[in-house]
Amino acid sequence: MLRWLEIGVLSAILSLGQGHFLSGSFNLTLYRHMPVLYQLDDYDLCLDNKAGTYCLVYVEILPNASSALWHQIDQVSQDSKHRFRHDRVFRGVCLENCKPSINNISEFEKEEILDKELISYYDKVHRRDETNSDRDLFYKDLVKGCLNHKFSEKFSLRTRSLIEYCVSASDKDLKLDLLDLTFYGILVVILFITLCSSFLDYRLRKMSSQKSEGFYREPLKDRIDFGLPPGQRLLTSFSVVRNYHRLVEPYYSDFSRDVSFFDGFRVIGVFAVILGHTLMVFMTVPIENPEFYEQFLFRFETSIFQNGSLVIQIFFVMSGFLLYVNFTKRQQIQPKTGTLECIAVYFRVFSYRYFRLLPSLLALILFNGTLLVRLQNGPFWRHLTEAERVFCRSNWWKNVFFVTNHMLEDSCSHQTWYLGADMQLFELFLIASQADKGNLHNTFSTCHCSTCYTDLRFRAGWYLPYSSGVGFYKL
């Protein structure tokens, strides 16, 4: 056992120093000779000109057997587990800078992007420019000639390109529609109710004999008091101070204290999830030193983040355990309970969980479909947020019915796949909890189906290729 531990530690130490293309040591000088992954012209300066137009372009570098630089690019790109695709790059092009090279367009053969899925994906996402098809057709030829001229002059390589979208200084801002107004209206209503509820709670405290902060920790009774209408618990349900105390109050029941250790697992799990998603986002946005992330993937501890999806299993296990304990404790199903009553209990418990999660999920969908795209503006912002705006408006039903994990293509908020998987496993766990306690065969069969379901989804995601819906992460 000690020898295996020594081998593991030695492997970890050796892995810290790993950093190469496919073999040998990492050479930063050779690395910097390759075309950078992202090169963006000054966005604000370009659009400061009234006639300025800025285009974000996806570029594929064409093979060139006689070029040593191309062989280096191809060698690096083959290591897909640790390296970016350096033969696929993004360029932010200010067309005013390209016009001097417009006479050179005829010198280059106009290559077309072969990835039809990518073209279809961009067509579905960037619908704002449908009315400018003639204008974009001219931009297409101009951008291709400009980029080919630059790559040929600097790297002796040729390219084919695809305009993702173009923005002109004369383009009007995105107009507000009914969905935008609905979201803003909901925000205003929630803010107004919160202020009124907090003020009412403050007034009740002033009228009460208990003036300390303990007033907010005690539940109010629904009675006519101090000349106020009944239903005080409902009217103060949006009180900021009262909800804060409810959030941080200690556990009182024995069961809550017994399972309080789950909070530690939750904190560790949430920390790992947030850290993993943060690293994922940094790998999909323009960065100055992509070699840092590539070298980071060679390190031993990186395997923790690469297998971060396994951390999610902690939440599945906790969810199933708490469901079983609560279900057994309340004894809603007895050995003599009839089938119809079991079905009624199933739908009652499922509906309670469904409608408890739905408001927060709808709020996320509305935010991504309306406000998210307006928070910032820049050369890469639409690339990151436009898909969310479009798909959250058209494919919201995948999230509402919790089937996102089965239908990731063109889905809204990919990260909500967990809610879909958790809800489906919750249904299976609920069925297993209602299985006849006298018939262990039924219980074990249901649990086996749950395990097979989880394993099947994991293996399908591991072996099947990504579709166009997640093409964003492939780039």
Can you describe what each PLM-predicted range is?
Residues 379-393, 453-456:
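Intrinsically disordered, low-complexity regulatory tails flanking kinase catalytic domains
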